[in-house]
Amino acid sequence: MGRQAASAVSVCLLVCVVVSLGQMWRISLLSSVRFHRWGVTSSPLSATGSQLVLSENGSRVKLDDFNNNSNTKAVYGNPVVNNSDIIKLYGNTRVVRPPPTILQLLDNIQRLGWTFNDSAIEIFRSQLENATRTREQFILTQQNAPVNASIGFSAQNGKFTITERIFDAEQETSPLTDRTFATCSLVGNSGLLAGSGCGREIDKADFVIRFNMPSVIPHWRDDIGTRTHLVTTNAHTIVSKFHHQPHNLPWVHAFRNFVRNCNLQTTHIFTLPFNVRGNGDFFLDFQETLKTNGFENKVLMNHPEHRRRVSEFWARDGLNEPTPTSGFYLVSAALSFCKHVRVFGFWPFLTDRRGRAVEYHYTLNYLHRDGGLTNWNHRIDREFFKLAELYRDGIIELVTDSCG
């Protein structure tokens, strides 16, 4: 029995060593410039050698010259995060303050100048569209979800069946299928927007997307703008913001006042009713209430299989999390129907670029004082680092400072 016990202990120790080595190996991969995770990622145009990058002294050099010149350090090729931050991202520790590498990258871009890289955008858009089929599958429609179709939930195993009720609630076709907007503004709700003066820049876009029924009121006009073409909502927002269930008359009055005060009377409302079981009937009630009471808003239901494809696409690119936030998900979708994507108010940290405290929401929502970092369904820190990579590569514009 003694030998058996010793043998068992030896096996356990061996397993622990192997697991630890495996963890160290994965972390080394994450920090290596040869892997597209949280370290340096090659440009989509690296094969052509035609992209200009910024050298350490600010001059522009061809990417092939940079690759062949070990003495040239490309500012845009700096790692987005360092090894210690990679370990946090890989584990359960949240990155709650902007790492120095992020701050340096953002400062370099601001100091040296930045433009959209249209060639890189086209390549990336093609890859993303081929993997996710956004134009066909982003919105649940009567074309892609006929009666009796069996469709999988996006955030859990299992499927649901398209009933007559669901079919009647679907749009015949997606209003975004054949549209390409020159510029889109995606506006998060970070306290970073307070005092930013970004309202005019946001409103310049051809298509403006906002999240979770924000307060788009005159008080915030200079910082967040006034226009909204699509706004997301979830079940919690629908109930808590208006203090009643959607079918109640007080809710109808409160919602009508809200959309009028926020200039949302004709805005498309985007919902995700089929992420998990149990939400479908609630959102159908919501949609039917709007229709019965004469609201002009069209409700667009997300196709859950599209969201799952988007999650799988980013997982292959190193972004693993239980569920992407609606913000990151909509950025991914917008890359298919917007030529240029500009992102405002996305900031997962407790301090800004100059170390000042930042509220989670510009409206000082005291229900979310932690910056959302304790929501274990999302890893908004991981998402932000991926957005920073896209910004560095000229694929999206990530606005993290004032616009004045």
Predicted regions and their residues:
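Metal-ion/cofactor- or nucleotide/acyl-coenzyme-handling active-site neighborhoods
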Residues: 2-404
